[in-house]
Curated annotation (Swiss-Prot):
Name used for this protein in its record: NADH-quinone oxidoreductase subunit N 1
GO terms of molecular function: NADH dehydrogenase (ubiquinone) activity; NADH:ubiquinone reductase (non-electrogenic) activity; quinone binding
Source organism of the structure: Herpetosiphon aurantiacus (strain ATCC 23779 / DSM 785 / 114-95)
Reactions it catalyzes: a quinone + NADH + 5 H(+)(in) = a quinol + NAD(+) + 4 H(+)(out)
Keyword Transmembrane: yes
GO cellular component terms attached to this protein's record: plasma membrane
UniProt xrefs under InterPro entries: NADH-Q_OxRdtase_suN/2, ND/Mrp_TM
Gene: nuoN1
Gene Ontology biological process terms from the UniProt entry: ATP synthesis coupled electron transport
C-alpha cells in the first residue's frame, strides 16, 4: 500500500495577517462576552484589536507581497484602504457604545459581528482572485445581515434584514454566475492571469467582445454595484438604512462601499484593462444616473435616514468617477474621497444617535428643530458634516469632490465632471435645509427631546470634525500621500 503524504500549503502571514488577526480577535471578543457583562471591556478589546490590525499593515509597509497562489496581495493600496476601513469601524464602535443599552439591545454580539464584517472587508480589499473576492463579499455580507436585524423587536429592523438577505442572496447569485462565465471563457480565476489570457486573445486575433465574457464581467459588476448602492441596483438601500439600527446604518454606508469599490478597482484595472473602452462607457452611464437619481430623490425626503440613504447613493456615483478615471490620479482621488466620506457620514449619523432615545427615534427633519438652542455644539458639528457632504470649502467634502471631478476631467470624462458639479449643486438644497431647520426653526414640542452626547460619542464626533477640517485645509498632503500609495493598482 502506497504511503500518503499530506503536504500543508505555505501560509504567508504577512499577506493574511490583517484579516486573519481581526477574525481571530472577533472570536476572542465573543468568548470574553460569555464571562463579563461590562460593555466597556468589550469596547476596549475591540478597539485594541482594530489598533493591532492597523499596526500589522505597517510592518511590511511599502512592500508588494502575494500569497496563496497569488489569490491575495499585501500592497500599499490595500493597506491604505484597510486603514480607512479600520478607522471607520473604530468610530462606529465609539458612537454605538451608549446607543445599544439606551435602545435596550443586546450588545455582546454586536462588537464581534462588526469585527467579523470588517475582517471580510479587509479580505475583500486584498483579493486578487475571483474566488477570494466571493469569499470576502459573503463574509462581510453574512455579518451585515445579522447586524441589520439586530433591533429585531422593532418591525422595521426585521423587515430590513429580510429584504437585505433576499436581495443580497440574489446579488451573490449574479456574482457566482459571473465568475463561472469568466472562468469558462478564460480558464482562469486569478485577475492577473485573466489579463494575460486576454492579451493572448489580442495577439492571436481573437475578439475580446465575446458576449459570454462580457456577460460574466457584467454579472460580477452587478454584484459589486449592489454592495455600493449603484443605480439601478440601489433599491434595497433606503429601506435597509431606515430599518437597521442607526450605528449599523452608519457603518454600512461607508465601510461596505469602501471595500466593494476597492475590489471593483482591482477587478477592472488588473483583470480587464483590455476592455476599458467598454466598461468605461457602461459605467459612465451608471455613474451619471447614480449621481442624478440619488440627489434628485433626496430632495423630496423628510425622513433623515432615508435622505442620507439617497445621499449615499449619490456619493457612490461620485466615487465611480474615480474608478472610471482608471489612472493614478483617479484612484488617489477615490481614496481621499473615501476618507472624507467616512468621516463625514459617520459624524452625521453620530449626531442622530445623540438625539435618539429609546422608543423615540430621530428620523424626521422636524425633530432637528431648535437643536441650535438645545445643543449648539451638536448643531455646529452637524453643520460641519452637512457642509462637507455638500462640498462646501474648506471641508474635506470640497477637497475630495474637487479631486474626483478633476481626475474625471483629465481622463476626458468631462461630461461626467459637469454632471457631478450640477448634481452637487442640487444636493446643496437638502443639506442646507438641515442646517436651516436646526438654527432657524423653533421646536413645536412643549418638552424638547433630550440629547445623549456621551463621552464616547462626543469623542467620535470630535475626531470626525477634526479630520474633516484637516483634510479640507491641507488637501495636498492627503492627496500626495494617496498618489504614493496607489501605484500597485493603477494601470
Amino acid at each position: 500500500m502506497n504511503d500518503l503524504t499530506f503536504i500543508t500549503p505555505e501560509i504567508n502571514w504577512t499577506v493574511l495577517g490583517m484579516p486573519a488577526f481581526l477574525m481571530i480577535w472577533a472570536m476572542l471578543v465573543l468568548i470574553v462576552d460569555m464571562f463579563t457583562s461590562d460593555r466597556r471591556v468589550l469596547l476596549t478589546l475591540s478597539l485594541i484589536g482594530l489598533g493591532v490590525t492597523a499596526a500589522l499593515g505597517a510592518l511590511d509597509y511599502g512592500s508588494t507581497i502575494s500569497g496563496f497562489s497569488d489569490m491575495l496581495v499585501f500592497d500599499k493600496f490595500g493597506v491604505l484602504v484597510n486603514w480607512i476601513l479600520l478607522a471607520g469601524t473604530a468610530l462606529t464602535l465609539l458612537i454605538a457604545f451608549d446607543y445599544m443599552p439606551r435602545q435596550n439591545l443586546s450588545q455582546g454580539e454586536f462588537y464581534p459581528l462588526v469585527l467579523f464584517a470588517t475582517s471580510g472587508m479587509l479580505f475583500l480589499v486584498q483579493s486578487t482572485d475571483l474566488v477570494t473576492i466571493f469569499i470576502g463579499v459573503e463574509t462581510l455580507s453574512i455579518a451585515l445581515y445579522v447586524l441589520t436585524g439586530f433591533a429585531v423587536p422593532q418591525f422595521k429592523s426585521g423587515e430590513a434584514a429580510i429584504k437585505y438577505l433576499l436581495l443580497g442572496g440574489f446579488a451573490a447569485g449574479f456574482l457566482v454566475y459571473g465568475i463561472a462565465l469568466i472562468y469558462g471563457m478564460t480558464g482562469k480565476t486569478n485577475l492577473a492571469q485573466i489579463a494575460n489570457e486576454l492579451s493572448t486573445w489580442q495577439s492571436t486575433g481573437k475578439a475580446l467582445d465575446d458576449p459570454i465574457l462580457l456577460a460574466g464581467v457584467g454579472f460580477v459588476l452587478i454584484a459589486l454595484g449592489f454592495k455600493v448602492s449603484m443605480f439601478p441596483f440601489h433599491a434595497w438601500t433606503p429601506d435597509v438604512y431606515e430599518g437597521a439600527p442607526t450605528p449599523v446604518t452608519a457603518y454600512m454606508s461607508v465601510a461596505t462601499k469602501g471595500a466593494a469599490f476597492a475590489a471593483m478597482l482591482r477587478f477592472l484595472n488588473v483583470a480587464f484593462p483590455a476592455l476599458k473602452p467598454e466598461w468605461q462607457l457602461l459605467f459612465g452611464l451608471f455613474a451619471a444616473a447614480t449621481m442624478a437619481y440619488g440627489n434628485i430623490v433626496a430632495v423630496a425626503q423628510t425622513n433623515l435616514k432615508r435622505m442620507l440613504a439617497y445621499s449615499s447613493i449619490a456619493h457612490a456615483g461620485y466615487m465611480l468617477l474615480g474608478v472610471l478615471a482608471a489612472s493614478e490620479k483617479g484612484i488617489s482621488a477615490f481614496t481621499v474621497y473615501l476618507l472624507a466620506y467616512t468621516l463625514t457620514n459617520l459624524g452625521a449619523f453620530a449626531v442622530l444617535i445623540a438625539l435618539e432615545n429609546r422608543g423615540m427615534p430621530v428620523f424626521e427633519l422636524s425633530d432637528l428643530r431648535g437643536l441650535g438652542k438645545r445643543s449648539p455644539l451638536l448643531a455646529l458639528a452637524m453643520t460641519v458634516f452637512m457642509f462637507s457632504l455638500a462640498g462646501v470649502p474648506p471641508t474635506a467634502g470640497f477637497a475630495s469632490k474637487f479631486g474626483i471631478f478633476r481626475a474625471a476631467w483629465d481622463a476626458n470624462l468631462d461630461y461626467l465632471a459637469i454632471i457631478g458639479v450640477v448634481t452637487s449643486v442640487i444636493s446643496a438644497f437638502f443639506y442646507l435645509r438641515v442646517i436651516v431647520t436646526m438654527w432657524m426653526r423653533d421646536t413645536e414640542a412643549t418638552e424638547p427631546q433630550p440629547t445623549y452626547a456621551t463621552a464616547s460619542l462626543s469623542l467620535g464626533v470630535i475626531v470626525a470634525v477634526i479630520g474633516i477640517i484637516a483634510v479640507g485645509i491641507l488637501p495636498n498632503i492627503f492627496t500626495d500621500l494617496a498618489k504614493a500609495l496607489v501605484l500597485t493598482v493603477a494601470p
